Amino acid sequence: MKVLAAMSGGVDSAVAAARAVDMGHDVVGVHLALSRSASGKRGCCTPRDAQDAAQAAQAIGIPFYVWDFSEEFQEKVIDNFISEYSAGRTPNPCLRCNEHIKFSSLLRRALALGFDAVCTGHYARVFLDEDGTYQLHRASSWAKDQSYVLAVLQQAQLKHCYFPLGATPSKKLVRQEADERGLKVSKKPDSHDVCFIPSSNTGAWLSQRIGRRDGDIIDDLGQRVGSHTGAFAYTVGQRKGLRLSSPAWDGKPRYVLDIEPISNTVVVGPRESLRVDELSGAFTTTGWCFTSRPIECSVQVRAHSDPVSAIAFIRDDVLVVRPDEPVFAVAKGQSAAIYRGTRVLGQLMIDNTKKYASS
């Protein structure tokens, strides 16, 4: 099989490429240049990362190239990130990158050049079912599982995905293997933050691009309790950094409950008001056919949160998910991954949430 290995400059993608070679595949390494800047200090798309990827490819013994996807990344990921926050929503840029860059733009180019699959260092597994369906499953290591950010992939993409690390029990073993292979990235730290925000201060980064927008912070009773310089700098569930001018009447902490972009208002209140009993919105599937008939499943609303048992069904052309127990601090724009056991059924882009009246 002819494999294009996407090499970020990290240890996971380097070991994945090496394993692809071990399996006898014809492997070519490629680093995606995603930043328009010639400098950078952190993330997965800096000049240093490109150098690390090139060194890893040389150590593995495979051809290596750098492909410029900065224009697509700007449009599909960065601009989307800014517009979503401007609209009071909370996007996941890693998911958008997988959807539009790694397994869309990159995959299309790979197929056009005669490659059979794109190999990445994601911790997930793909199986071919007897009926010809490609199933996306969690990784063997739930601690490192990344199926949440891959749940948006569909059959045409899964058919060409190759995840050599999916059955690896732990990241420690991957680092150990990299060290044994002589890969200098064996001890390189993981990247956890948004790769295109060097400071990791999302609010300040957004403010530089959107501009200052003064507004009010109100409580759930409509009373003004503070002010802000940009509602886009807040997200549902946030507790720290609110700088409220008056304490809560009950003395308990306040959390961001909602962001109203039209009035440029941030609404705060007690944690109980963050409870969500129903999620709904547009959806994609990995091959599963959702219908109006409810199915038992589980839902995961964040990359590193625990799944919650739920039911899912179609209502008025949108996917509705009702967790068996409430989930908290779910923002519009977030993604929810739907599972049956370890299998990923699909992805819900959360447009609406509901809280049922307490009994």
Swiss-Prot record:
Family, as annotated: Belongs to the MnmA/TRMU family.
A biological-process GO annotation: tRNA wobble position uridine thiolation
InterPro entries in the record: MnmA-like (IPR004506), MnmA-like_C (IPR046885), MnmA-like_central (IPR046884), MnmA-like_central_sf (IPR023382), Rossmann-like_a/b/a_fold (IPR014729)
Protein's name according to its UniProt entry: tRNA-specific 2-thiouridylase MnmA
Residues annotated as binding ATP: A6, M7, S8, G9, G10, V11, D12, S13, L32, G121
Active site per the UniProt annotation: C97 (nucleophile), C195 (cysteine persulfide intermediate)
Task of the protein: Catalyzes the 2-thiolation of uridine at the wobble position (U34) of tRNA, leading to the formation of s(2)U34.
Catalysed reactions, as listed in the record: S-sulfanyl-L-cysteinyl-[protein] + uridine(34) in tRNA + AH2 + ATP = 2-thiouridine(34) in tRNA + L-cysteinyl-[protein] + A + AMP + diphosphate + H(+)
EC number: 2.8.1.13
Organism per entry: Tropheryma whipplei (strain Twist)
Gene name as annotated: mnmA
Alphabetized UniProt keyword annotations: ATP-binding, Cytoplasm, Disulfide bond, Nucleotide-binding, RNA-binding, Transferase, tRNA processing, tRNA-binding
UniProt-annotated stretches for the region Interaction with tRNA: 144-146
Disulfide bond sites: C97-C195
Claim: Acyltransferase is one of the keywords in the record: no
Domain of life of the source: Bacteria
Pfam families reported in the protein's UniProt record: tRNA_Me_trans, tRNA_Me_trans_C, tRNA_Me_trans_M
Taxonomic classification: Bacteria, Bacillati, Actinomycetota, Actinomycetes, Micrococcales
Site (Interaction with tRNA): H122, Q334
GO cellular component: cytoplasm
CDD domains: MnmA_TRMU-like
Record Gene3D superfamilies: Adenine nucleotide alpha hydrolases-like domains, HUPs, Translation factors
Subcellular location field: Cytoplasm
